[in-house]
Swiss-Prot record:
Effect of inactivating the gene: Leads only to slight reduction of virulence. Severely affects growth and displays an altered morphology, when the calnexin DNJ1 is also deleted.
Annotated Basic and acidic residues bias: 221-231
Underlying gene: CNE1
Protein name (Swiss-Prot/TrEMBL): Calnexin
Gene3D superfamilies named among the record's database cross-references: 2.60.120.200, Calreticulin/calnexin, P domain
Entry's transmembrane regions: 441-461
Region (Disordered): 191-275
Length: 523
């Protein structure tokens, strides 16, 4: 467990390496992005609750923490859980975590880079067309000893919010996995079936030495060699011909031109015939044609030629020599293997963030790496579940304040509340209904009539919510008795996983609980 307490710098080290790009490794970027541990500036939750913050935009960042002893996932569940808070949003960049592989050579924090071997990469990433929650694991080929990245198919979409978001990955020994966002399941599947490239190669492959015979005929249809062009087939007949049945309309002025010189136009005084040439009056539509059926020479309209046949070609027939589509013969795959337990990942020696982003002030907090999903859930209940209530109330208050400042009035405030509800419902429909039941009811009543909608949403605007923030000395203060007991129990159990648990879980506070209660009472 990592909560970024005051002694965090004793455990975490920034990288001094450079990231090389291009095939010839000629372009290098130093990992000089700044890291800091501080409280959030946007929608702060619990008093004194700080996290690891990526401070620089458009820079390479790398920071890591090595465990006292490696975590071995073999034969056990593996849980990866952490919080992300996108204080400035996420327009282009990553916010994922890497579980670093425990290798014989070991991991040197000063040299941590994109080349450092990792076991799992998990978390949000967005840039251009990319917008997904990564789940990548590196799998070792038992025949060659080489590692290959396996990417989850059809990944979940991340939650791009300025409030905290909880990402949880659970991998079971039966090779199943499940991804949760804010405790809601977003993606589940099997390591053996839902990754690309697949863990296990095919049992048979095309024979690379097999070649298509020179006399192989793979043209299914051919022109009939016995067919001849009919004697009455006229290839020169035009596609269209004049309509001989057409009659010139009455009133057609065939002797009148469509345009005439403008009788009112006069040659400009500055016009010089020697320099500018002979002057001609500009043309205007012939006024006599306005009421007539038409002017100028009458021409018959054209129609499709019934005798037209076009160029003759022989009809197609089945090719008597056709042998079908040629395919090489298959042979047993010499590189075939079957790994039935890819969830037996390589031992994990530490965690790290190796990121590039165009958005600064991305905050990470409350990291859990272990074997017990119930422990992770209990840890989230004492941390994330408490702060998110406070953060969402602040977000709602800010949204309402902005609507008032913009002079949106009653209709604008209704729209603001509805937009907030819709935004939350896209990520968590049930949670949105619980948090904003009046808006949910109002939208439902809209199907019965506009007046009902206005009345119900008006009820929403009748009251405001207040959030009281109280502080105590120190970064982390004592949790409520029951919560504190749960947190200590989680910390003691997690020690067996090899992950450092600093001073037990100390982020939940009586003050924090009081803030939630006060906010509810103020309503």
């Amino acid at each position: 467990i990592e909560q970024f307490t005051s002694d965090w710098s004793e455990r975490w080290s920034t990288s001094q390496a450079s990231k090389f790009q291009r095939e010839d490794d000629t372009e290098a970027f130093k990992y000089d992005g700044v890291w800091s541990v501080e409280e959030p500036e946007v929608f702060p939750g619990l008093a004194g609750d700080a996290g690891l913050v990526l401070k620089s935009k458009a820079k390479q960042h790398a920071i890591s923490h090595l465990f006292d002893s490696p975590i071995d996932p073999k034969g056990k569940p593996l849980v990866v859980q952490y919080e992300v808070k996108l204080q400035k949003g996420l327009s282009c960049g990553g916010a994922y975590i890497k579980l670093l592989s425990a290798t014989e050579a070991g991991v040197t924090p000063d040299e941590f880079s994109d080349k450092t071997p990792y076991t799992i990469m998990f978390g949000p990433d967005k840039c251009g067309q990319t917008n997904k929650v990564h789940f990548i694991f590196r799998h070792k080929n038992p025949k060659t000893g080489e590692f290959e990245e396996k990417h989850v198919k059809y990944p979940a979409y991340p939650k791009l919010a300025k409030t905290s978001t909880l990402y949880t990955l659970v991998v079971q020994p039966d090779q199943s996995f499940e991804i949760f966002i804010n405790n809601e399941s977003k993606k589940k599947g099997s390591l053996l079936e839902d990754f690309e490239p697949p863990v296990n190669p095919p049992t048979e492959i095309d024979d690379p030495e097999d070649e298509k015979p020179a006399d192989w005929v793979d043209q299914a249809r051919i022109f009939d060699p016995k067919a001849t062009k009919p004697e009455d087939w006229d290839e020169d007949a035009p596609l269209e011909i004049p309509d001989q049945d057409a009659v010139k309309p009455d009133g057609w002025l065939e002797d009148e031109p469509l345009t005439i010189p403008d009788p009112d136009a006069q040659k400009p005084e500055e016009w010089d015939d020697d320099e500018d040439g002979e002057w001609f009056a500009p043309s205007i539509p012939n006024p006599k044609c306005e009421a007539a059926a038409g002017c100028g020479e009458w021409v018959r309209p054209v129609i499709r030629n019934p005798a037209y046949k076009g160029k003759w070609t022989a009809p197609l027939i089945d090719n008597p020599e056709y042998k079908g589509v040629w395919e090489p013969r298959t042979i047993a795959n010499p590189n075939y293997f079957e790994d039935k337990s890819p969830a037996d990942f390589n031992p994990i020696g530490g965690v790290g963030f190796e990121l590039w982003t165009m958005d600064e002030d991305i905050l990470f907090d409350n990291i859990y790496i272990g074997h017990d999903p119930s422990q992770a859930k209990a840890f989230a209940a004492e941390t994330f579940d408490q702060k998110i209530k406070i953060e969402q109330r602040q977000e709602d208050k800010e949204t309402a304040a902005k609507a008032a400042e913009d002079g949106a009035g009653f209709v604008g405030q209704v729209r603001s509340h509805v937009n907030t509800f819709i935004g939350r419902a896209r990520q968590d429909p049930i949670g949105a209904i619980k948090e904003m039941p009046q808006v949910a009811g109002g939208l439902g009543a809209a199907f019965a009539g506009l007046l009902g909608l206005v009345g119900l949403v008006g009820g929403v605007l009748g009251g405001g919510s207040k959030v009281k923030v109280t502080t105590k000395d120190g970064k982390k203060v004592d949790a409520p008795t029951a919560a504190k007991g749960k947190a200590k129990e989680v910390t003691e159990k997690v020690k067996a996983t090899g992950v450092q648990a600093k001073d037990a879980v100390t982020k939940r506070t009586n003050a924090a609980a009081a803030k939630v209660d006060d906010a509810a009472n103020d309503e």
